[in-house]
Regions:
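Bacterial Sec-dependent N-terminal signal peptides
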Residues: 1-26
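Residue-level marker of positions within ordered structural domains that often coincide
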Residues: 6, 17, 34, 212, ...
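Alpha-helical protein-protein interaction scaffolds
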Residues: 22-169
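Hydrophobic alpha-helical membrane segments
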Residues: 60, 74, 91-100, 107, ...
Length: 276
């Protein structure tokens, strides 16, 4: 009975939605968009796409859905519909917005494929392509190519050089050095990546087990020490080295994210999107 009622309710709901005027729904979508309710606007545009079988409103609806999805942060949907718009309308702006949606999704591999296929026909378009391509190259770790691309823009060479000096500094830190430091003196491997609290904790823990090991073999003999304390000491000693390596990778990722965001702040404002 409950299942039958649910199905009945679904049919009533669908029927009432399909009876609603398409033009009225578009008006609701546009009103929602104008007042900044982008999620609601996207919902109305989706409804029009679903129920309008004539296709008369496709161009308007797809564009509205693409923009409202982008502005609401639903970049997966905006990428899809900006791509659709590139086939429906002339102009490079929609292709560029598709690429920006992919970047917002952190889908940098597909974004790079799209930006390499992007063929602008004016100087502004070429600059847009160079900015986005350089940002993508940086995020993907191709720092030499990214720097080469940014230098072509001739925007802020001093700040750019500062960013890439920081890149070189971070890249000099290696997992092997973090492990060796931790092996020689517990805690220094963590401090190497500026995780000082973790380094102190590692030093205290391993020192405690080391002291317990010495105390045990002194009072109860080598065999008892090896059996009871040594496995724990080795576990935390080796664990400290592994932790130092992992924390270094985490530190480097954080540093590169910060540097990437600095580049975005510097260059993203130079992107100009034209839909004429």
């Amino acid at each position: 009975m409950k299942i039958a009622f649910s199905i009945f309710w679904i049919f009533i709901t669908v029927g009432s939605m399909s009876a609603q005027s398409i033009s009225q729904t578009i008006e609701l979508a546009e009103t929602s968009f104008e007042i900044g309710q982008y999620d609601e606007a996207a919902s109305f545009y989706k409804r029009v796409l679903f129920f309008d079988k004539s296709g008369d409103f496709d161009s308007l609806t797809v564009e509205g859905l693409a923009w409202s999805s982008y502005l609401s942060g639903d970049y997966d949907v905006s990428a899809k519909y900006f791509k659709t718009l590139t086939r429906m309308k002339e102009g490079e702006g929609y292709e560029l917005m598709e690429i920006l949606s992919l970047v917002k999704l952190d889908d940098f591999l597909n974004a790079k494929r799209s930006v390499l296929a992007y063929r602008p026909d004016n100087e502004i378009g070429e600059q847009n392509k160079q900015i986005i391509k350089s940002l993508i190259d940086f995020y993907l770790g191709d720092y030499a190519k990214a720097k080469e691309g940014f230098l072509k823009l001739d925007a802020s060479p001093d700040q750019l050089n500062e960013v890439f000096r920081s890149v070189d500094k971070v890249n000099k830190k290696t997992k092997m050095k973090a492990i060796l430091l931790s092996a020689v003196f517990p805690g220094t491997g963590q401090a190497y990546s500026r995780h000082y609290k973790e380094g102190i904790n590692s030093l205290i823990t391993i020192s405690a087990f080391g002291a317990a090991y010495v105390f045990t073999i002194t009072n109860y003999g080598l065999v008892v020490g090896l059996i009871s304390v040594s496995p724990w000491f080795q576990r935390y000693y080796v664990g400290g080295m592994n932790s130092a390596a992992d924390l270094l990778e985490e530190y480097k990722a954080e540093q590169f994210d910060q540097l990437y965001n600095r580049l975005v702040s510097e260059y993203a404002g130079m992107i100009q999107v034209n839909f004429e």
